[in-house]
Protein backbone atom coordinates (compact mmCIF):
# COMPACT_ATOMS: atom_id res chain seq x y z
CA UNK A 1 0.00 0.00 0.00
CA UNK A 2 1.34 3.42 -0.98
CA UNK A 3 2.44 5.53 1.96
CA UNK A 4 0.30 8.61 2.61
CA UNK A 5 1.96 11.81 1.40
CA UNK A 6 1.35 14.97 3.39
CA UNK A 7 0.41 17.38 0.62
CA UNK A 8 -0.14 21.03 1.50
CA UNK A 9 -3.63 22.19 0.53
CA UNK A 10 -3.54 25.76 1.83
CA UNK A 11 -1.09 28.18 3.42
CA UNK A 12 -2.58 30.77 5.76
CA UNK A 13 -1.94 34.47 5.21
CA UNK A 14 0.88 36.03 7.25
CA UNK A 15 1.90 32.63 8.60
CA UNK A 16 5.34 31.13 9.13
CA UNK A 17 4.70 28.77 6.21
CA UNK A 18 3.99 31.71 3.89
CA UNK A 19 7.13 33.47 5.07
CA UNK A 20 9.16 30.32 4.33
CA UNK A 21 7.60 30.10 0.84
CA UNK A 22 5.78 26.84 1.48
CA UNK A 23 3.04 26.58 -1.15
CA UNK A 24 0.01 24.41 -2.00
CA UNK A 25 1.23 21.22 -3.65
CA UNK A 26 4.37 20.99 -1.52
CA UNK A 27 4.89 17.78 0.45
CA UNK A 28 6.07 17.81 4.08
CA UNK A 29 8.55 14.94 4.42
CA UNK A 30 10.12 15.28 7.87
CA UNK A 31 10.25 17.52 10.92
CA UNK A 32 13.48 17.49 12.94
CA UNK A 33 14.50 14.34 11.08
CA UNK A 34 11.32 12.51 12.08
CA UNK A 35 8.96 10.92 9.56
CA UNK A 36 5.38 12.11 10.01
CA UNK A 37 2.73 9.40 10.37
CA UNK A 38 -0.31 11.59 11.01
CA UNK A 39 -1.60 14.83 12.49
CA UNK A 40 -0.58 13.69 15.99
CA UNK A 41 3.07 13.52 14.94
CA UNK A 42 2.87 16.80 13.06
CA UNK A 43 1.41 18.74 15.99
CA UNK A 44 3.87 17.17 18.42
CA UNK A 45 7.01 17.85 16.41
CA UNK A 46 6.22 21.47 15.51
CA UNK A 47 5.88 22.37 19.20
CA UNK A 48 9.38 23.73 19.66
CA UNK A 49 11.20 27.04 19.37
CA UNK A 50 13.50 25.75 16.64
CA UNK A 51 12.50 23.17 14.05
CA UNK A 52 13.83 21.89 10.74
CA UNK A 53 11.22 21.03 8.13
CA UNK A 54 12.08 18.98 5.05
CA UNK A 55 9.83 19.93 2.14
CA UNK A 56 9.60 18.47 -1.37
CA UNK A 57 8.53 20.96 -4.03
CA UNK A 58 6.37 19.92 -7.02
CA UNK A 59 9.47 19.89 -9.29
CA UNK A 60 11.16 17.35 -7.00
CA UNK A 61 13.55 19.74 -5.26
CA UNK A 62 13.88 19.21 -1.51
CA UNK A 63 14.23 22.20 0.82
CA UNK A 64 15.40 21.96 4.42
CA UNK A 65 13.82 24.93 6.19
CA UNK A 66 15.24 26.17 9.50
CA UNK A 67 12.51 27.87 11.53
CA UNK A 68 12.74 29.92 14.72
CA UNK A 69 9.34 30.51 16.33
CA UNK A 70 7.38 30.60 19.57
CA UNK A 71 7.13 27.18 21.22
CA UNK A 72 3.42 26.60 20.50
CA UNK A 73 3.18 28.73 17.34
CA UNK A 74 1.52 26.97 14.40
CA UNK A 75 3.08 26.94 10.93
CA UNK A 76 -0.17 27.91 9.20
CA UNK A 77 -0.52 24.85 6.97
CA UNK A 78 -3.70 23.00 6.00
CA UNK A 79 -3.26 19.56 4.45
CA UNK A 80 -5.29 17.85 1.73
CA UNK A 81 -6.03 15.11 4.26
CA UNK A 82 -6.73 16.74 7.61
CA UNK A 83 -5.70 13.57 9.48
CA UNK A 84 -2.57 13.12 7.34
CA UNK A 85 -3.48 9.42 7.36
CA UNK A 86 -6.35 7.04 6.52
CA UNK A 87 -9.48 7.32 8.65
CA UNK A 88 -10.14 4.52 11.14
CA UNK A 89 -13.60 3.01 10.88
CA UNK A 90 -15.76 1.69 13.70
CA UNK A 91 -15.43 -1.97 14.74
CA UNK A 92 -18.67 -1.99 16.73
CA UNK A 93 -22.24 -2.89 15.82
CA UNK A 94 -23.95 -0.76 18.47
CA UNK A 95 -27.60 -1.58 19.08
CA UNK A 96 -28.41 2.15 18.98
CA UNK A 97 -26.21 3.23 16.05
CA UNK A 98 -27.99 5.95 14.08
CA UNK A 99 -25.97 5.32 10.92
CA UNK A 100 -27.58 1.87 10.72
CA UNK A 101 -30.95 3.64 10.80
CA UNK A 102 -30.34 5.84 7.77
CA UNK A 103 -32.65 5.31 4.81
CA UNK A 104 -31.15 3.87 1.62
CA UNK A 105 -29.98 6.07 -1.23
CA UNK A 106 -28.00 8.69 0.71
CA UNK A 107 -24.44 9.74 -0.21
CA UNK A 108 -21.73 7.22 0.69
CA UNK A 109 -20.07 9.40 3.34
CA UNK A 110 -23.29 9.34 5.40
CA UNK A 111 -22.87 5.59 5.91
CA UNK A 112 -19.20 5.71 6.96
CA UNK A 113 -18.78 4.95 10.66
CA UNK A 114 -15.69 6.62 12.04
CA UNK A 115 -14.22 5.78 15.43
CA UNK A 116 -10.91 7.58 15.07
CA UNK A 117 -9.23 9.02 18.15
CA UNK A 118 -7.63 11.74 16.06
CA UNK A 119 -11.06 13.11 15.16
CA UNK A 120 -11.78 13.37 18.87
CA UNK A 121 -9.09 16.02 19.17
CA UNK A 122 -9.55 17.67 15.78
CA UNK A 123 -13.34 17.82 15.57
CA UNK A 124 -14.63 16.89 19.02
CA UNK A 125 -15.99 13.52 17.87
CA UNK A 126 -16.89 10.97 20.54
CA UNK A 127 -15.15 7.60 20.24
CA UNK A 128 -15.63 4.23 21.93
CA UNK A 129 -11.89 3.37 22.31
CA UNK A 130 -12.59 -0.20 21.16
CA UNK A 131 -10.33 -0.07 18.11
CA UNK A 132 -7.39 1.47 19.96
CA UNK A 133 -4.31 -0.61 20.62
CA UNK A 134 -2.22 -0.17 23.76
CA UNK A 135 0.36 1.73 21.72
CA UNK A 136 -2.36 4.15 20.55
CA UNK A 137 -3.24 4.88 24.17
CA UNK A 138 0.43 5.27 25.08
CA UNK A 139 0.90 7.67 22.17
CA UNK A 140 -1.95 9.91 23.33
CA UNK A 141 -0.44 9.97 26.80
CA UNK A 142 3.08 10.63 25.50
CA UNK A 143 1.90 13.52 23.31
CA UNK A 144 -0.56 14.64 26.01
CA UNK A 145 -3.29 15.17 23.43
CA UNK A 146 -6.46 16.47 25.00
CA UNK A 147 -9.31 16.45 25.59
CA UNK A 148 -10.38 12.99 24.53
CA UNK A 149 -14.13 12.57 24.09
CA UNK A 150 -15.37 9.09 24.96
CA UNK A 151 -18.62 7.33 24.10
CA UNK A 152 -18.99 5.35 27.31
CA UNK A 153 -22.71 4.39 27.35
CA UNK A 154 -22.24 2.12 30.37
CA UNK A 155 -19.43 1.18 32.75
CA UNK A 156 -20.84 -2.34 33.20
CA UNK A 157 -18.34 -4.46 31.19
CA UNK A 158 -20.78 -7.21 30.20
CA UNK A 159 -23.52 -4.75 29.28
CA UNK A 160 -21.14 -2.61 27.24
CA UNK A 161 -20.03 -5.66 25.25
CA UNK A 162 -23.70 -6.42 24.51
CA UNK A 163 -24.62 -2.83 23.64
CA UNK A 164 -21.64 -2.35 21.32
CA UNK A 165 -21.68 -5.98 20.12
CA UNK A 166 -17.94 -6.08 20.60
CA UNK A 167 -16.24 -8.54 22.95
CA UNK A 168 -13.42 -6.05 23.56
CA UNK A 169 -15.73 -3.25 24.72
CA UNK A 170 -15.66 -4.26 28.39
CA UNK A 171 -12.23 -2.79 29.10
CA UNK A 172 -13.49 0.80 29.10
CA UNK A 173 -12.73 1.48 32.77
CA UNK A 174 -9.13 0.29 32.34
CA UNK A 175 -8.68 2.64 29.39
CA UNK A 176 -10.18 5.58 31.27
CA UNK A 177 -8.04 4.81 34.31
CA UNK A 178 -4.89 5.09 32.17
CA UNK A 179 -5.97 8.49 30.86
CA UNK A 180 -6.94 9.58 34.37
CA UNK A 181 -3.59 8.52 35.84
CA UNK A 182 -1.81 10.45 33.08
CA UNK A 183 -3.93 13.55 33.67
CA UNK A 184 -5.43 13.53 30.16
CA UNK A 185 -8.63 15.66 30.23
CA UNK A 186 -11.70 13.72 29.12
CA UNK A 187 -15.40 14.21 28.37
CA UNK A 188 -17.93 11.40 28.36
CA UNK A 189 -21.21 10.58 26.68
CA UNK A 190 -23.98 8.10 27.44
CA UNK A 191 -26.60 7.29 24.80
CA UNK A 192 -29.47 6.05 26.94
CA UNK A 193 -31.63 3.14 25.79
CA UNK A 194 -34.86 2.38 27.62
CA UNK A 195 -34.73 -0.73 29.79
CA UNK A 196 -31.07 -1.35 28.95
CA UNK A 197 -28.61 1.15 30.43
CA UNK A 198 -31.04 3.43 32.28
CA UNK A 199 -32.24 3.25 35.90
CA UNK A 200 -29.75 1.54 38.20
CA UNK A 201 -27.31 0.99 35.33
CA UNK A 202 -27.28 4.74 34.71
CA UNK A 203 -26.68 5.38 38.41
CA UNK A 204 -23.77 2.94 38.35
CA UNK A 205 -22.25 4.53 35.24
CA UNK A 206 -22.46 8.09 36.54
CA UNK A 207 -21.06 7.05 39.91
CA UNK A 208 -18.15 5.18 38.31
CA UNK A 209 -17.33 8.00 35.90
CA UNK A 210 -17.53 10.64 38.62
CA UNK A 211 -14.57 8.81 40.14
CA UNK A 212 -12.51 10.19 37.25
CA UNK A 213 -13.53 13.81 37.92
CA UNK A 214 -12.22 16.43 37.64
CA UNK A 215 -9.87 14.93 35.00
CA UNK A 216 -13.04 13.79 33.28
CA UNK A 217 -14.53 17.24 32.97
CA UNK A 218 -18.10 16.47 31.91
CA UNK A 219 -20.57 13.73 31.05
CA UNK A 220 -23.68 14.06 28.89
CA UNK A 221 -26.70 11.77 28.87
CA UNK A 222 -28.72 11.81 25.64
CA UNK A 223 -31.72 9.72 24.56
CA UNK A 224 -31.30 7.23 21.74
CA UNK A 225 -32.58 8.41 18.37
CA UNK A 226 -35.07 6.02 16.75
CA UNK A 227 -35.79 6.39 13.03
CA UNK A 228 -38.31 4.50 10.89
CA UNK A 229 -35.53 2.39 9.38
CA UNK A 230 -34.92 -0.24 12.04
CA UNK A 231 -35.98 -3.41 10.23
CA UNK A 232 -33.79 -6.27 11.42
CA UNK A 233 -32.17 -4.14 14.13
CA UNK A 234 -32.33 -4.49 17.91
CA UNK A 235 -35.76 -3.48 19.23
CA UNK A 236 -35.61 -0.13 21.01
CA UNK A 237 -38.41 1.72 22.78
CA UNK A 238 -38.80 5.51 22.96
CA UNK A 239 -38.76 7.26 26.33
CA UNK A 240 -41.99 8.89 27.54
CA UNK A 241 -42.40 11.96 29.75
CA UNK A 242 -42.32 9.92 32.96
CA UNK A 243 -39.07 8.25 31.87
CA UNK A 244 -37.59 11.66 31.05
CA UNK A 245 -38.47 12.99 34.50
CA UNK A 246 -36.80 9.98 36.15
CA UNK A 247 -33.62 10.48 34.11
CA UNK A 248 -33.49 14.16 35.09
CA UNK A 249 -34.00 13.30 38.76
CA UNK A 250 -31.12 10.81 38.67
CA UNK A 251 -28.82 13.28 36.94
CA UNK A 252 -29.70 16.24 39.16
CA UNK A 253 -29.04 14.12 42.24
CA UNK A 254 -25.51 13.42 41.03
CA UNK A 255 -25.07 17.07 40.04
CA UNK A 256 -25.52 18.11 43.67
CA UNK A 257 -22.88 15.62 44.79
CA UNK A 258 -20.46 16.71 42.06
CA UNK A 259 -20.90 20.40 42.81
CA UNK A 260 -20.11 19.85 46.48
CA UNK A 261 -16.95 17.87 45.63
CA UNK A 262 -15.59 19.58 42.52
CA UNK A 263 -17.42 22.87 42.08
CA UNK A 264 -18.90 21.72 38.77
CA UNK A 265 -22.09 19.83 37.94
CA UNK A 266 -20.16 17.17 35.95
CA UNK A 267 -23.13 15.25 34.49
CA UNK A 268 -25.72 16.89 32.25
CA UNK A 269 -29.05 15.90 30.72
CA UNK A 270 -29.54 16.96 27.11
CA UNK A 271 -32.29 19.47 26.36
CA UNK A 272 -34.56 16.77 24.98
CA UNK A 273 -35.08 15.28 28.45
CA UNK A 274 -36.33 18.59 29.88
CA UNK A 275 -38.62 19.28 26.92
CA UNK A 276 -40.13 15.79 26.99
CA UNK A 277 -40.60 15.96 30.76
CA UNK A 278 -42.24 19.39 30.47
CA UNK A 279 -39.68 20.93 32.81
CA UNK A 280 -37.93 24.31 32.49
CA UNK A 281 -34.34 24.40 31.31
CA UNK A 282 -31.67 24.86 34.00
CA UNK A 283 -29.94 28.23 34.30
CA UNK A 284 -26.71 28.95 32.43
CA UNK A 285 -24.63 28.40 35.57
CA UNK A 286 -25.68 24.74 35.61
CA UNK A 287 -23.99 24.04 32.27
CA UNK A 288 -20.40 24.69 33.43
CA UNK A 289 -19.48 26.74 30.37
CA UNK A 290 -21.49 24.61 27.92
CA UNK A 291 -18.79 21.96 27.49
CA UNK A 292 -21.37 19.49 26.15
CA UNK A 293 -23.37 21.82 23.88
CA UNK A 294 -22.50 19.80 20.75
CA UNK A 295 -24.40 16.90 22.34
CA UNK A 296 -27.53 19.02 22.68
CA UNK A 297 -26.80 20.02 26.28
CA UNK A 298 -27.72 23.63 26.98
CA UNK A 299 -28.52 24.65 23.40
CA UNK A 300 -31.92 26.06 24.34
CA UNK A 301 -30.63 27.92 27.40
CA UNK A 302 -27.71 29.39 25.48
CA UNK A 303 -29.92 30.42 22.56
CA UNK A 304 -32.53 32.05 24.79
CA UNK A 305 -30.01 33.95 26.92
CA UNK A 306 -28.19 35.27 23.85
CA UNK A 307 -31.52 36.14 22.24
CA UNK A 308 -32.84 38.21 25.14
CA UNK A 309 -29.53 40.00 25.58
CA UNK A 310 -29.40 40.93 21.89
CA UNK A 311 -33.06 41.93 21.73
CA UNK A 312 -32.62 44.19 24.75
CA UNK A 313 -29.80 46.08 23.07
CA UNK A 314 -31.82 47.03 19.97
CA UNK A 315 -34.16 50.04 20.28
CA UNK A 316 -37.73 49.46 19.11
CA UNK A 317 -38.78 51.12 15.86
CA UNK A 318 -41.64 51.06 13.36
CA UNK A 319 -39.96 48.97 10.65
CA UNK A 320 -42.28 46.76 8.60
CA UNK A 321 -40.98 43.28 7.94
CA UNK A 322 -42.33 39.77 7.45
CA UNK A 323 -40.20 36.65 7.69
CA UNK A 324 -40.53 32.95 8.40
CA UNK A 325 -38.53 30.59 10.59
CA UNK A 326 -37.84 26.87 10.14
CA UNK A 327 -37.59 24.70 13.24
CA UNK A 328 -37.89 21.07 14.23
CA UNK A 329 -40.70 19.70 16.38
CA UNK A 330 -38.59 19.47 19.55
CA UNK A 331 -37.87 23.18 20.05
CA UNK A 332 -40.90 24.62 18.24
CA UNK A 333 -42.52 26.02 21.39
CA UNK A 334 -39.29 27.75 22.42
CA UNK A 335 -38.71 29.29 18.98
CA UNK A 336 -42.36 30.35 18.75
CA UNK A 337 -42.05 32.17 22.07
CA UNK A 338 -38.90 33.98 20.95
CA UNK A 339 -40.63 35.06 17.74
CA UNK A 340 -43.51 36.46 19.79
CA UNK A 341 -41.02 38.48 21.87
CA UNK A 342 -39.72 40.11 18.69
CA UNK A 343 -43.27 40.87 17.53
CA UNK A 344 -44.04 42.48 20.89
CA UNK A 345 -41.10 44.84 20.59
CA UNK A 346 -41.39 45.54 16.86
CA UNK A 347 -45.11 46.04 16.29
CA UNK A 348 -44.89 45.93 12.49
CA UNK A 349 -42.74 42.80 12.28
CA UNK A 350 -44.61 39.56 11.54
CA UNK A 351 -42.90 36.19 11.97
CA UNK A 352 -44.26 32.84 10.80
CA UNK A 353 -42.70 29.92 12.69
CA UNK A 354 -43.05 26.61 10.86
CA UNK A 355 -42.68 23.29 12.64
CA UNK A 356 -41.18 20.84 10.14
CA UNK A 357 -42.11 17.21 10.75
CA UNK A 358 -39.36 14.74 9.83
CA UNK A 359 -40.88 12.52 7.15
CA UNK A 360 -37.43 11.55 5.87
CA UNK A 361 -36.18 9.75 9.00
CA UNK A 362 -39.53 9.34 10.76
CA UNK A 363 -41.66 11.36 13.15
CA UNK A 364 -39.79 10.19 16.27
CA UNK A 365 -36.81 12.22 15.04
CA UNK A 366 -37.62 15.73 16.22
CA UNK A 367 -34.32 17.64 16.33
CA UNK A 368 -33.77 20.48 13.88
CA UNK A 369 -30.30 19.28 12.85
CA UNK A 370 -31.74 16.19 11.12
CA UNK A 371 -34.22 18.02 8.91
CA UNK A 372 -33.81 17.53 5.17
CA UNK A 373 -34.27 19.86 2.23
CA UNK A 374 -37.11 17.82 0.77
CA UNK A 375 -39.15 17.92 3.99
CA UNK A 376 -38.64 21.67 4.32
CA UNK A 377 -39.57 22.21 0.68
CA UNK A 378 -42.65 19.98 0.80
CA UNK A 379 -44.03 21.46 4.00
CA UNK A 380 -43.40 25.11 3.13
CA UNK A 381 -44.63 25.21 -0.46
CA UNK A 382 -47.68 27.45 -0.66
CA UNK A 383 -47.09 28.90 2.82
CA UNK A 384 -46.64 32.58 3.66
CA UNK A 385 -42.87 33.03 3.89
CA UNK A 386 -42.48 36.79 3.82
CA UNK A 387 -39.32 38.54 2.66
CA UNK A 388 -36.99 35.82 3.87
CA UNK A 389 -36.84 32.34 5.34
CA UNK A 390 -34.62 31.82 8.40
CA UNK A 391 -32.87 28.46 8.26
CA UNK A 392 -30.71 27.11 11.13
CA UNK A 393 -27.15 26.44 10.01
CA UNK A 394 -27.13 22.99 11.62
CA UNK A 395 -29.49 21.73 8.90
CA UNK A 396 -26.61 22.05 6.42
CA UNK A 397 -23.37 20.12 6.04
CA UNK A 398 -20.47 21.91 7.71
CA UNK A 399 -18.97 24.49 5.33
CA UNK A 400 -21.23 23.36 2.48
CA UNK A 401 -24.69 24.48 1.35
CA UNK A 402 -26.13 20.98 1.18
CA UNK A 403 -28.72 19.11 3.26
CA UNK A 404 -28.55 15.51 4.49
CA UNK A 405 -30.64 14.37 1.52
CA UNK A 406 -28.23 16.05 -0.96
CA UNK A 407 -30.63 18.85 -1.82
CA UNK A 408 -28.66 22.07 -2.17
CA UNK A 409 -29.53 25.41 -0.66
CA UNK A 410 -29.90 26.86 -4.17
CA UNK A 411 -32.43 24.15 -5.03
CA UNK A 412 -34.50 24.99 -1.95
CA UNK A 413 -34.24 28.70 -2.67
CA UNK A 414 -35.42 28.13 -6.25
CA UNK A 415 -38.29 25.88 -5.18
CA UNK A 416 -39.62 28.31 -2.57
CA UNK A 417 -38.73 31.52 -4.41
CA UNK A 418 -37.58 33.25 -1.26
CA UNK A 419 -34.40 34.72 0.17
CA UNK A 420 -32.85 32.30 2.69
CA UNK A 421 -30.98 33.62 5.72
CA UNK A 422 -28.72 31.08 7.41
CA UNK A 423 -29.02 31.57 11.16
CA UNK A 424 -25.81 30.89 13.04
CA UNK A 425 -26.11 28.89 16.25
CA UNK A 426 -26.63 31.88 18.53
CA UNK A 427 -29.57 33.94 19.69
CA UNK A 428 -28.17 37.26 18.48
CA UNK A 429 -28.18 36.08 14.87
CA UNK A 430 -31.77 34.88 15.23
CA UNK A 431 -32.80 38.40 16.27
CA UNK A 432 -30.78 39.97 13.47
CA UNK A 433 -32.25 37.72 10.79
CA UNK A 434 -35.81 38.06 12.04
CA UNK A 435 -35.86 41.86 11.85
CA UNK A 436 -34.25 42.11 8.42
CA UNK A 437 -30.58 42.55 9.33
CA UNK A 438 -27.76 41.63 6.99
CA UNK A 439 -26.03 38.27 7.32
Question: Where is each model-derived feature located?
Answer:
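PDZ/PDZ-like groove recognition
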Residues: 1-12
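Radical SAM enzyme core and accessory elements
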Residues: 7, 278-439
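Terminal peptide-recognition signature
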Residues: 17, 25-28, 53, 97
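Conserved PDZ fold ligand-binding element
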Residues: 19-37
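Short, Lys/Arg- and Gly-enriched loop/turn segments at beta-strand edges
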Residues: 35-42, 61-64
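Conserved Radical SAM active-site core
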Residues: 61-62, 69-215, 225-254
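Structural preference for beta-strand elements that scaffold enzyme active sites
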Residues: 147-149, 185-187, 218-220, 266-268, ...
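Flexible glycine/acidic-rich beta-alpha junction loops that bind and position SAM and/or redox cofactors
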Residues: 196, 216-242, 261-285, 358-363
Amino acid sequence: MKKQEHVVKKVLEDSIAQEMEIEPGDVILEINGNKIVDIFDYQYYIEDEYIEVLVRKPDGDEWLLEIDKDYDEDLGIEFENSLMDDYKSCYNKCIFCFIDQNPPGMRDTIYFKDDDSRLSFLQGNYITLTNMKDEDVDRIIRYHLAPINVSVHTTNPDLRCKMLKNRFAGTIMDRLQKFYDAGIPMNGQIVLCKGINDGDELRRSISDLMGFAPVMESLSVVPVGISDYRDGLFKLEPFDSRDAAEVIDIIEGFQKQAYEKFGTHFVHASDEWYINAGRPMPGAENYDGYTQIENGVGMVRSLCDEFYEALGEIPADDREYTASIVTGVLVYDHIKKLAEEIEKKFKNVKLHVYKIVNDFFGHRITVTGLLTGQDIKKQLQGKELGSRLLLPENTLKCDEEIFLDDMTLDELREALQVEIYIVKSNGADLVNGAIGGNS
